[in-house]
């Protein structure tokens, strides 16, 4: 939706009204939908620098970087608040002196207030169906209009860790929770005409009908070199109490399409923090299960890409991907049954990103969230490292091993 920018009197440039990204399954920072193939998130200069100096070998495993936009609050005639994005003019301040978005400061405050008080409502089910909306209205806009508050009852089930039914919602609650918390703080702490810088990134799930997404926090260490002692201790405690310490990886969120009941099964980071090693293995199994059967044909292409990523990470000397995540993505919509004598749908050659040799089923493996990534050559870096990231490699090796066990039926 294009709107007129009301941030400055006399400055009536066209803008894009942002929508919540309904397939966000983890993270604190609100991710917004810019268009069908693009999402945006508050700009962190370290992350922007990473994307702009990205090693060529890593590009296939990261979202495409599409630049930046400025974002401001916009109020429509009914008083409804939303975020509107405008392209950044070339004449604006250069990259090297850009400051952190005020939106990032709000996100960091949100981390402090929600970091340890997670809800026990860790499993949600939401139907992937059309909400009641006008022909030109997207599902995200209809959702915001029909459910303006987080605790508004709707259609789908949310359970606690004991399986008790406690709440019903019509959407994956995590992305909207991040969006509404972010919007509330922006509204209360900054004027309407305050401009914030956002990154534009590829929407890596846009090509999927029913995107199944697993968000994995990688590595044995999650705090950046610039973390305060309090934050460092908090992150070290989370790692020690989760599979991050013993496996180098933990679940930060996931959604899995259940074909039998036509809804997404959703779990959040609080669920992931409580898992044992065996619980982590069972969660990976569940991520590959559609409610009817295990999607075994996904295992080989996922393993193929993870091994390729492992090879790339081993070649990236000095890089430390602290607090970054790894997305595993596939389509919950299975290919149609083949006719007798026709090629198997999983054997058809694919040229799209994420395809594997031999025409393996389409999957995507993408690294995201580089706000705390460090490497030699980063501007004004005080701490540098030698060799590849041992914690990330440890996590990838264990992830591959567990998926191999599932593949072999153990």
Swiss-Prot record:
User: Where does it reside?
Assistant: Cytoplasm
List the keywords (alphabetical): ATP-binding, Cytoplasm, Kinase, Nucleotide-binding, Transferase
Query: Which Gene Ontology cellular component annotation is one that this UniProt entry carries?
Result: cytosol
In this UniProt entry, which cysteines form S-S bonds?
Answer: none
Q: Which residues bind substrate?
A: 211-219
Per its UniProt record, what SUPFAM superfamilies does this chain match? SAICAR synthase-like
What is this enzyme's catalytic activity, as reactions?
A: 1D-myo-inositol hexakisphosphate + ATP = 5-diphospho-1D-myo-inositol 1,2,3,4,6-pentakisphosphate + ADP; 1-diphospho-1D-myo-inositol 2,3,4,5,6-pentakisphosphate + ATP + H(+) = 1,5-bis(diphospho)-1D-myo-inositol 2,3,4,6-tetrakisphosphate + ADP
Molecular-function GO term, any one: inositol hexakisphosphate 5-kinase activity
* One of the protein's GO biological processes: inositol phosphate biosynthetic process
InterPro entries, A to Z: IPK (IPR005522), IPK_sf (IPR038286)
Identify the EC number(s). 2.7.4.21
Provide the free-text tissue specificity comment from this protein's UniProt record. Detected in brain.
Q: What is the effect of changing residue 325 to A?
A: Strongly reduces activity
The record's listing under Pfam families reads: IPK
What domain of life?
Answer: Eukaryota
Q: Where is this region: Disordered?
A: 333-358
Enzyme class, spelled out: transferase
Tell me which family the UniProt entry assigns to this protein: Belongs to the inositol phosphokinase (IPK) family.
Q: What does this protein do?
A: Converts inositol hexakisphosphate (InsP6) to diphosphoinositol pentakisphosphate (InsP7/PP-InsP5). Converts 1,3,4,5,6-pentakisphosphate (InsP5) to PP-InsP4.
Entry protein name:
Inositol hexakisphosphate kinase 3
């Amino acid at each position: 939706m294009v709107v007129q920018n009301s941030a400055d009197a006399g400055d009536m440039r066209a803008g894009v009204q942002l929508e919540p990204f309904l397939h966000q399954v983890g993270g604190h920072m609100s991710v917004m939908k810019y268009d069908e193939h693009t999402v945006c998130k508050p700009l962190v200069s370290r992350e922007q620098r990473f994307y702009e100096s990205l090693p060529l070998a890593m590009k296939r495993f990261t979202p495409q970087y599409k630049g930046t936009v400025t974002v401001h609050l916009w109020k429509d005639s009914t008083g409804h608040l939303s975020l509107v994005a405008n392209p950044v003019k070339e004449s604006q301040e250069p990259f090297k002196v850009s400051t952190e978005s005020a939106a990032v400061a709000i996100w960091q405050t949100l981390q402090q207030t929600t970091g340890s008080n997670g809800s026990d409502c860790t499993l949600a089910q939401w139907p992937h169906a059309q909400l009641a909306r006008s022909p030109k209205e997207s599902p995200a806009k209809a959702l915001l209009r029909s459910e303006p508050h987080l605790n508004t009852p709707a259609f789908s089930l949310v359970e606690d860790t004991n399986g008790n039914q406690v709440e019903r919602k019509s959407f994956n609650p995590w992305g909207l929770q991040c969006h509404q918390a972010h919007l509330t703080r922006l509204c209360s702490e900054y004027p309407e005409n305050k401009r914030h810088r956002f990154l534009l990134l590829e929407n890596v799930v846009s090509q999927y009908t029913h995107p199944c997404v697993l968000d994995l926090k990688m590595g044995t260490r999650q705090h950046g070199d610039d973390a305060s002692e309090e934050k460092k201790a908090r992150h070290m405690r989370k790692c020690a109490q989760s599979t991050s310490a013993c496996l180098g990886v933990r679940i930060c969120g996931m959604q899995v399409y259940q074909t039998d009941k036509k809804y997404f099964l959703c779990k959040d980071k609080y669920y992931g923090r409580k898992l044992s090693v065996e619980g982590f293995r069972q969660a990976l199994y569940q991520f590959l299960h559609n409610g009817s059967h295990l999607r075994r044909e996904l295992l080989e292409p996922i393993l193929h890409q993870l091994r390729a990523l492992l090879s790339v990470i081993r070649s990236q000397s000095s890089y430390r991907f602290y607090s970054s995540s790894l997305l595993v993505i596939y389509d919950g919509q299975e290919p149609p049954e083949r006719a007798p004598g026709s090629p198997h749908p999983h054997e058809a050659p694919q040229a799209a990103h994420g395809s594997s040799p031999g025409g393996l089923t389409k999957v995507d493996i993408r690294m995201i969230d580089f706000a705390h990534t460090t490497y030699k050559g980063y501007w004004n870096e005080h701490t540098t490292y030698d060799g590849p990231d041992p914690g990330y490699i440890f996590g990838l090796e264990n992830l591959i091993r567990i998926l191999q066990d599932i593949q072999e039926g153990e």
